[in-house]
């Protein structure tokens, strides 16, 4: 519950108020879906005056859209290193190539683990993201999906990638799995250690999938060695 001091601070800082409203909206959206979300309900959860909430978001649709966009950017910031606010790849980022496969695989494994752990520890947020993707006319406009697909495409187009990879299919299969896996984790893992182990399992299998779905055969020995040493 917001204190009087919190409310006074928010009156002086509209950005803080907006951030509090969006955080509350994520909670309501994950719990009740878009049908159960209203500006007044979110205002109550956020601990702000309803009139203040309406100053930021006059209609429910504006609040839903702003909340979904903030979730995509939160995912982007959490699992990708650098880049622009619209999903752009950072300038100067090392591109994958077969002469540096050890480093490429290390980076892929680290990314897989970051995303798997984040999805497991923030399953409500991921549920909101899935809702957004399912409700969009063009899911590829989502900044998080856009950046993920670009990463898969960069790997596929490198001299380590196989020809004719369907980048869109690979991206959808992998991301869907990342955000469904927490359902199984919730049913089986009762501790942070157990959740981390299940995150590791998923991350390693995504890496193995890349071996057969994206990478050329002559790179497999390096990836197999990595898997053997980390399984």
List the predicted regions and their residue ranges:
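N-terminal intrinsically disordered/low-complexity leader segments
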Residues: 1-16, 27, 83-96, 218-231
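C-terminal peripheral helix-coil segments that are non-catalytic and often amphipathic
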Residues: 2-4, 121, 153-158, 177-231
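The short coil/loop that forms the "turn" connecting the two helices of the helix-turn-helix
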Residues: 16-17, 48, 121
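Helix-turn-helix
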Residues: 20, 24, 28-62, 66-67
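Short, basic, alpha-helical segments at the C-terminal edge of helix-turn-helix-like DNA-binding modules
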Residues: 41, 69-76, 80-84
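Alpha-helical DNA-contacting segments of helix-turn-helix folds
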Residues: 64-71, 140, 144
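Amphipathic alpha-helical packing segments from all-alpha helical-bundle domains
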Residues: 79, 102, 106, 110, ...
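Short linear capping/connector segments at secondary-structure termini
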Residues: 90-97, 129-135, 190-191
